[in-house]
Amino acid sequence: MAQVQYYGTGRRKSSVARVRLVPGEGRVIINGRDFENYIPFAALREVVKQPLVATETLGNYDVLVNVNGGGYTGQAGAIRHGIARALLKADPEYRLTLKRAGLLTRDARMKERKKYGLKGARRAPQFSKR
């Protein structure tokens, strides 16, 4: 018998997460490692769990994630986005809950590029009056 799986792709900054939800007991596996070992900060682990907490499905699915690009914050945001999209495929009734929590919106904020003549994106070289 084929097992039911729900897929979702999440993006944040330069990170892309491919998320697979499988009915299970609530394990979160990121790149083959348990998410407590993969994400070192408790606050970011909470970010990853937000869609499951919002829809009250924390112990219902095993979450299998492949994520690459970016750092911890970008990856956590991408995983959150991917889980939210996968939950939406699992049950379309979650749309209102996830949308109100702002979990279906792709966070479009990206690093601003460095401009020539400046030291960073906006930082100008030191000004000397004399």
UniProtKB/Swiss-Prot annotation:
<dbReference type="GO" id="GO:0022627">
    <property type="term" value="C:cytosolic small ribosomal subunit"/>
</dbReference>
<dbReference type="InterPro" id="IPR000754">
    <property type="entry name" value="Ribosomal_uS9"/>
</dbReference>
<comment type="similarity">
    <text>Belongs to the universal ribosomal protein uS9 family.</text>
</comment>
<dbReference type="GO" id="GO:0003735">
    <property type="term" value="F:structural constituent of ribosome"/>
</dbReference>
<dbReference type="GO" id="GO:0006412">
    <property type="term" value="P:translation"/>
</dbReference>
<dbReference type="InterPro" id="IPR020568">
    <property type="entry name" value="Ribosomal_Su5_D2-typ_SF"/>
</dbReference>
<dbReference type="InterPro" id="IPR020574">
    <property type="entry name" value="Ribosomal_uS9_CS"/>
</dbReference>
<dbReference type="InterPro" id="IPR014721">
    <property type="entry name" value="Ribsml_uS5_D2-typ_fold_subgr"/>
</dbReference>
<protein>
    <recommendedName>
        <fullName>Small ribosomal subunit protein uS9</fullName>
    </recommendedName>
</protein>
<keyword id="KW-0689">Ribosomal protein</keyword>
<keyword id="KW-0687">Ribonucleoprotein</keyword>
<dbReference type="GO" id="GO:0003723">
    <property type="term" value="F:RNA binding"/>
</dbReference>
<dbReference type="InterPro" id="IPR023035">
    <property type="entry name" value="Ribosomal_uS9_bac/plastid"/>
</dbReference>
<dbReference type="Pfam" id="PF00380">
    <property type="entry name" value="Ribosomal_S9"/>
</dbReference>
